[in-house]
């Protein structure tokens, strides 16, 4: 059974990566009300979230409020609560907050024919964990800036084929 977290005022909304380039694990982290929720995600999900938040920020007034850098950084130890599935974004204009909803990805066994029975049975709902958090425009901006740092800290891309170059070398298909 999934959990539902509804945080009206986030103390921190962060992203980061653990591990070496090429083998990093990305996380989102929400800190509010004395609780920390760490969500494993893909690098592309962090990039897309930062991109959409930046687009939304264009329509929000700049409050000029500085955010403590700690609030946009992962707090260790990072203990994964769930794996990110879908993301929803919105704006709470009266309170000048951005609404971010992070939903757990439900993993199913594709080889199990019984999964179709489970999905058709109203008594056996599959509940995912959901985190709904409201962040200030300043917190969203800090998240985007932190995301940029981690996204650009990955492996360099080959100038001929565009694929990432591993520390051990690169067999470029354009030259093989």
Task: Annotate each predicted stretch with a short phrase.
Residues 1-20, 26, 64-130:
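Intrinsic, low-complexity N-terminal interaction/targeting segments
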Residues 40, 90, 132-134:
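Generic structural detector for well-ordered beta-strands
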């Amino acid at each position: 059974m999934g959990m539902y977290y509804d945080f009206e005022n986030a103390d921190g909304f962060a992203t980061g990566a653990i591990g070496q380039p090429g083998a990093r694990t990305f996380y989102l982290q929400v800190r509010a009300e004395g609780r920390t929720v760490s969500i494993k995600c893909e690098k592309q999900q962090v990039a897309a979230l930062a991109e959409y938040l930046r687009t939304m920020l264009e329509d929000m007034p700049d409050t000029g409020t500085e955010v403590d850098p700690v609030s946009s950084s992962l707090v260790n130890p990072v203990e994964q609560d769930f794996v990110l599935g879908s993301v929803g974004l919105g704006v709470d204009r009266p309170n000048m907050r951005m609404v971010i909803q992070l939903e757990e990805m439900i993993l199913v066994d594709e080889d199990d024919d019984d999964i179709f029975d489970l999905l058709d049975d109203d008594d056996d709902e599959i509940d995912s964990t959901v985190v709904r958090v409201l962040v200030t425009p300043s917190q969203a901006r800090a998240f985007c800036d932190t995301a940029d740092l981690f996204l650009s800290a990955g492996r360099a891309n080959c100038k001929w084929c565009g694929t990432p170059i591993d520390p051990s070398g690169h067999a470029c298909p354009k030259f093989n």
